[in-house]
Amino acid sequence: MIQPQTLLNVADNSGARKLMCIRVIGTAGNQRYARIGDVIVAVIKDAVPQMPLERSEVIRAVIVRTCKEFKCEDGIIIRYDDNAAVIIDQKGNPKGTRVFGAITEELRELNFTKIVSLAPEVL
């Protein structure tokens, strides 16, 4: 579960390395915590030099991995080792061209099909 002030890793090659959650936009209503598939507003805390995204820039991101266990529709429980997000634009398309690490199938149902197609492994 991601809440404001949570630090996240970036799971794409957009140029940012670490994010800090500022606000949970989510998918429905006024949510306090973000789960897999929810959209957040975040600030870049660490970035790769000479890239378009810079430190202290405010961006939108979608959560792709959380340390808190996540129960799938078929009953399988998935838990990751880190909290990670993919940086997106206003239309929901990823800013990077590659996605690192495993991604859950539920992102496809939430209309993040472009992120799922870039992922090397879908659980």
UniProtKB/Swiss-Prot annotation:
One of its GO terms (molecular function) is large ribosomal subunit rRNA binding. The keyword RNA-binding applies. Gene3D superfamilies: Ribosomal protein L14. GO terms for biological process: translation. Keywords: Chloroplast, Plastid, Ribonucleoprotein, Ribosomal protein, RNA-binding, rRNA-binding. The keyword Ribonucleoprotein applies. It is found in: Plastid, Chloroplast. Its main location: plastid. InterPro entries: Ribosomal_uL14, Ribosomal_uL14_bac-type, Ribosomal_uL14_CS, Ribosomal_uL14_sf. It holds the Pfam family Ribosomal_L14. It comes from the Eukaryota. GO terms for cellular component: chloroplast; cytosolic large ribosomal subunit. Binds to 23S rRNA. Part of the 50S ribosomal subunit. Belongs to the universal ribosomal protein uL14 family. HAMAP family: Ribosomal_uL14. This is Large ribosomal subunit protein uL14c. It comes from Brachypodium distachyon.
